[in-house]
């Protein structure tokens, strides 16, 4: 039986830090579902459809990745996808407390769902979508932090 994992997030937009995590996850699991949350409360810059399309393009080189949008409760989504592993990236100690709370709640809702925490490579450890957007809004060069297609879309969105 295949080991299916979900890597959820808002990915507004997906960064090279996210690509780093999902690339390493593909080496650990047979099938990785990159699950893009609708997250209307976060008021994303890109629509869910745009985020899905950008992420599909940015991960096209990864053969065992499926990109899908979702708006369901994570535990329900994982159950429907027959996934038993939830991948989460941890950049800093500050991320840990929140992620621990999520992991405990997800385990309560779906006991067979295991949370696996991956640290990004040092090069990406300080990057977040929010930070990249903020720097780009002020005409800072964020080319290094985004896949090329995502960088082009961000520049167009801010124009």
Swiss-Prot record:
A family per Pfam: CTP_transf_like
GO process annotations (BP): coenzyme A biosynthetic process
Cross-referenced InterPro entries: Cyt_trans-like, PPAT, Rossmann-like_a/b/a_fold
CC terms in the record's Gene Ontology section: cytoplasm
Enzyme class: transferase
Annotated site, Transition state stabilizer, chain positions: 18
Required cofactor(s): Mg(2+)
Residues the entry annotates as binding substrate: 10, 42, 74, 88
Annotated localization: Cytoplasm
Coiled coil: none
UniProt KW keywords: ATP-binding, Coenzyme A biosynthesis, Cytoplasm, Magnesium, Nucleotide-binding, Nucleotidyltransferase, Transferase
Any one GO MF annotation of this record: ATP binding
Annotated pathway: Cofactor biosynthesis; coenzyme A biosynthesis; CoA from (R)-pantothenate: step 4/5
Annotated binding of ATP, by residue: 10-11, 18, 89-91, 99, 124-130
Catalytic activity: (R)-4'-phosphopantetheine + ATP + H(+) = 3'-dephospho-CoA + diphosphate
Enzyme Commission no: 2.7.7.3
Subunit structure: Homohexamer.
Cited function: Reversibly transfers an adenylyl group from ATP to 4'-phosphopantetheine, yielding dephospho-CoA (dPCoA) and pyrophosphate.
NCBIfam families cross-referenced by the UniProt entry: coaD_prev_kdtB, cyt_tran_rel
Family of this protein: Belongs to the bacterial CoaD family.
Protein name according to UniProt: Phosphopantetheine adenylyltransferase
Source species: Shigella sonnei (strain Ss046)
